[in-house]
Amino acid sequence: VGTGFPVIFMLSSLFMGIGTGATIMIAQFYGARDLEKVNQTVNTIYTALIIGIIPLSLIGIFLSEPLLRLMQVPDDGTLAMAKTYMIIIFIGIIGNLGFNINSGILQGLGDSRTSLLFLMIATVINIILDLVFTIPIKLGVAGVALATIIAQIASWLFGVFYINRRYDF
């Protein structure tokens, strides 16, 4: 699981940077009470997420093994497990990136506590599903990855729902 983190982080960093820029713009527009520009910025960032997620997922899926080999991950079973984990994570990477974008939007709106709450909920979901997928179902590393993406996608969708219900822009 930890072996694939540097690759996942490297390929996700672009969206983290975009999210940071959006946070700054949203904060400026929201502070100026220009809700139309807040809305445009939020829509633009979600559009960038949707458009960019497919190429990012495909790049991550297809480069998983070559990048793990470049990192000299041993081929004693560790490589296969790390590759399985990474492929599943990249299939569901929209949850991670979507959560980060929602977090940036909320921070730009002056609400940093709600994204922390969604993160805590995702953590509880992840722990419960880790136990379910690895003990009774025995999915191993694939179960851990599946639990992670389900928790992240749930957290992202909670955020989308909250932002749409709470903020009128």
Question: Where are the regions a protein language model picked out?
Answer:
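Small-residue-rich hydrophobic transmembrane alpha-helices
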Residues: 1-55, 96-115
